[in-house]
Amino acid sequence: MILRISLIFAALILASCAPTPQVKQIPRVQAQPAVISTGNEDLTSMTTMRQIVARVEPIGEQICRDTDRVSNCDFKIQVDTSTPDVVNAYQTLEKDGRPLVIFSIGLLKAARNTDEVAFVLGHEMAHHIAGHIQQRRGSAGLGGLILGGLIAYSGGSAQNVDSAFDLGAAVGSRVYSKDHELQADEIGTLITYYAGYDPVRGSKFFTRIPDPGDKFLGSHPPNAARIDRVNRTMARVR
C-alpha cells in the first residue's frame, strides 16, 4: 500500500509541471530597434536602469497577456540598494498579486553591459509569465500532504508527520526548479530579443557565476545547459 501511495505521489508531482507557454512571435520592428551596448554604460545608474526597463517591461507584459497563464501582468521593477555585495535578482508577488522583480545593486555592479541586465530582467519576468510561483507552491503543498500522509498512514507520531510534511514540501518545491529556470531562460530570451537587446551576449553573465552542476534536486541547471537553451531559442527566431 505504501508503495502504491508513493507511486501516486511521484505521478502527481510529475504531472504538476506545465509545459513552456507558447510565445507569439512579435515582429522586432514593432517592438524595439536593436540596442548597441558599448559596455561603458554605468549600469548602477538609475537612469540606465530606467532605460532598460522602458524597453523590456512592455515586451514582457505583452507576452504575459498573450500567453494568458496568469491574471496580473502589471510588473513592478525595483532595485535593492541595501545589498551592495549580493549578486541576485528574483521575482515575487506583492500582497495584491502584482508581480515584482527585484535586482540587487550588487548584480548591476557585476553586469558588464545592458544586454546582461536586460536578459536577467526578461528571465525574471518569464518566471511570472510561466506561473512558476503558483506551480512551485502547488508542488510543495502536494509533496507535503502526500509524504505527511504516508507517515500518518504508517502510524507515525504527530512530530514525525510534521517533519515528513516539511520534507515533502521541500522536495516538491524543487522537483521542477531546473525546468523552471530553463523555461524562464527560453521566454526571457524572446523578451530580451524583442526588446532590442542581444540575449546571446546577455547570457554570457552565466559564464561568470558559479556553475551549480547537475545536482539532484538542485535549484538551477548547469550553466552550459542554460546557454544552450538561449542559443537554440535564438536559432528559431533569427
Map each language-model feature to its residues.
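Metalloprotease/metallohydrolase-associated module, dominated by Zn2+-dependent proteases
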Residues: 155-202
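C-terminal motif of bacterial Sec signal peptides marking the signal peptidase cleavage site
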Residues: 13-16
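Peri-catalytic and regulatory segments of divalent metal-dependent proteins
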Residues: 19-139, 195, 215-217, 237
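Solvent-exposed, polar/charged alpha-helical surfaces in well-ordered, non-transmembrane soluble domains
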Residues: 47-54, 58, 101, 105, ...
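Sec-dependent signal peptide recognition
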Residues: 2-8
